[in-house]
């Protein structure tokens, strides 16, 4: 009798293992296809899928394959595992920068031998925390874009405290620009007041650069993907940010008068989002500085466990990107992005002549 019971139990266990193993495998394979298509299509309606990084989905998919492998033995498991690994390596934002180098090479000490070298930093100040601006200034930047910025008075007091008369400041309510040289503030539409700070910067050598610090609409953080309302909210927020960015970039382009342009800030969107497609469509040939020369992990949020890259610096064709990195901070929930740019000699000379 006991032997019969054991036999039935083993039979039931075998059936359970078979169907559960195939269930895990089908879910993993289907998820792989869905994530791949979501990356290709980048449609607003599926924007919720583009918030977690590709490697996070890869870990889920590979975990399902591993669980399936304990239950059933099939070559399809290996095929789906290889598909997940290939998907992650090819599509993950981190793969490209890690291929250039495992560790950042940009140092705190700036090369001062070239007068056309410009160091740019963008950082979210985490609720107007002045200490993060102090951190940024230790890198001797020529330009700092801040979001959730300290007030103009607080920034001016910091410069007086440091007895640094090279810098000027514009903005300071949500976005601000701190730069060496002469800043001339630009007026943006009132609807963008809480999302931008724009200025033209005249460098000591007379070159003029158009600058913009931006902070797009806050993202939602809900992850209940089984709830239709979650997808709707992500969809609407993504559309709001796209409208903001298009309006901001259109205004920036109209104000620049063909000057060299640098803009950056907190985009509040995963780099897998279709939000960033607006930049080449409106601005043309612009370079994401970390994409061009960054090494190591470029993710900026959160500071202590960076899983997504939402803070960026972009430069026009007038600049060459020397180096870039994402740097851990002590006083913000974001990491700061630091980039060294070289204003091309021809462009510098042309603007001096004009």
Where are these regions (language model features)?
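Catalytic-adjacent loop/helix segments of enzymes that bind and process anionic phosphate/sulfate esters
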Residues: 186-252, 348-354
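Structured beta-strand-rich core segments of catalytic domains in phosphoester-bond hydrolases
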Residues: 89-109, 131, 143, 147-220, ...
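Short, solvent-exposed loop/turn segments at secondary-structure junctions
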Residues: 126-128, 151, 183, 216-219, ...
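Metal-dependent phosphoester-hydrolase catalytic domains
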Residues: 6-78, 200, 253-261, 267-354
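Short extracytoplasmic/periplasmic juxtamembrane "stem" segments immediately C-terminal to an N-terminal membrane anchor
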Residues: 105-127
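Structural motif corresponding to alpha-helix initiation and N-cap regions
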Residues: 129-130, 307
């Amino acid at each position: 009798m006991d032997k019969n019971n054991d036999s039935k139990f083993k039979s039931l266990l075998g059936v359970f293992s078979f169907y559960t193993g195939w269930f895990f495998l089908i879910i993993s394979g289907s998820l792989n296809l869905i994530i791949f298509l979501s990356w290709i299509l980048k449609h607003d309606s599926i924007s919720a899928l583009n918030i977690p990084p590709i490697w996070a989905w890869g870990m889920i998919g590979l975990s399902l394959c591993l669980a399936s492998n304990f239950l059933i033995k099939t070559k399809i498991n290996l095929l789906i595992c290889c598909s997940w690994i290939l998907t992650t390596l090819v599509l993950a934002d981190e793969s490209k920068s890690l291929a250039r180098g495992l560790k950042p090479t940009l140092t705190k000490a700036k090369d001062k031998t070239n007068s056309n070298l410009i160091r740019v930093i963008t950082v979210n100040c985490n609720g107007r925390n002045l200490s993060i601006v102090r951190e940024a200034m230790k890198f001797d930047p020529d330009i700092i874009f801040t979001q959730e910025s300290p007030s103009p008075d607080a920034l001016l007091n910091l410069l007086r405290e440091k007895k640094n008369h090279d810098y000027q400041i514009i903005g300071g309510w949500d976005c601000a620009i701190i730069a060496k040289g002469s800043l001339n503030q630009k007026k943006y539409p009132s609807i963008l007041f809480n999302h931008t700070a724009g200025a033209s910067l005249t460098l000591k050598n007379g070159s003029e650069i158009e600058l913009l610090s931006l902070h797009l609409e806050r993202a939602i953080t809900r992850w209940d993907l089984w709830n239709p309302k979650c997808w709707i909210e992500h969809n609407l927020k993504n559309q709001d940010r796209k409208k903001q960015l298009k309006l901001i970039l259109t205004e920036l382009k109209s104000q620049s008068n063909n000057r060299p342009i640098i803009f950056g800030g907190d985009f509040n969107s995963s780099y897998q989002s279709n939000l960033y497609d607006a930049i080449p469509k409106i601005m043309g040939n612009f370079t994401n500085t970390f994409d061009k020369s960054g090494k190591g992990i470029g993710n900026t949020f959160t500071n202590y466990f960076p899983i997504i890259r939402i803070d960026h610096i972009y430069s026009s064709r007038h600049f060459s990107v020397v180096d870039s990195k994402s740097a851990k901070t002590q006083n913000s929930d974001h990491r700061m992005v630091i980039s060294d740019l070289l204003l091309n000699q021809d462009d510098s000379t042309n603007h001096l002549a004009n």
